A protein has these predicted regions:
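Extended, charge-enriched "interface" segments that sit outside catalytic cores
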Residues: 2-8
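Histidine- and acidic-residue-rich, metal-dependent catalytic cores
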Residues: 11-190
Length: 190
């Protein structure tokens, strides 16, 4: 029985190790990520309130790490709320844990700018992180296609205003829509 606080710490350290490994040219440890996703789902199923409130605590760490952790928790909570089965919840949480791995290939100066401060050229370069992440996952054996679809499409928006493809409505995979909702929710509330 893993406490929510310990699990939150485990996720945070795993995300840090994941990003560091990719930065150093390593591969994604999909087995470890999948295990953590399963623990998040189990924790949310057992006690959704404790885990979701814990995720609201502002981390003093770099924003991306905190955002990934909080978004993964919200993915589990929201997935449970809308009645996803355990397999889909695991895919959703895994995808959210991995959604930003492509950012390690962007210059740090670009990551410190908020969306409104970026020039059109900088915004175009920033948006490449999605494809960088997809390429990294495709080069890693054992990553489920559903997880790759979530990473690839989590920035798409129902009205077609998202990226990288500008997909509209039902062209966006369902779990990617859910990932987009929870990551936007976390970004707006933090």
């Amino acid at each position: 029985n893993v406490s929510a606080e310990k699990l939150h710490g485990d996720i945070k350290s795993n995300v840090g190790a994941l990003m560091s490994g990719i930065q150093q040219g390593g591969v994604v440890e999909i087995k470890k990520t999948t295990q953590l996703a399963g623990l998040v789902v189990d924790s949310v199923v057992r006690n959704p309130d404790a885990f979701s409130w814990l995720s609201r605590i502002r981390d003093k760490d770099e924003f991306t790490y905190g955002h990934i952790v909080r978004s993964a928790v919200w993915a589990g909570v929201f997935g449970r709320h809308i009645g996803l089965d355990k397999k889909d919840m695991n895919m959703l949480v895994s995808g959210v844990l991995l959604k930003d791995i492509g950012k390690v290939k962007l210059p740090e100066s670009l990551l410190t700018l908020d969306e409104k401060s970026r020039s059109p050229e900088q915004e175009a370069e920033y948006r490449c992180y999605v494809n960088y992440g997809v390429d990294t996952l495709k080069a890693t054996s054992g990553v489920p296609a559903e997880v790759i679809h979530i990473v690839k499409n989590h920035c798409e928006r129902f009205d077609g205003s998202g990226y990288p493809q500008g997909l509209i409505g039902d062209k966006i995979p369902f779990l990617a829509k859910v990932a987009g909702i929870v990551t936007t929710y976390d970004a707006v509330t933090n």
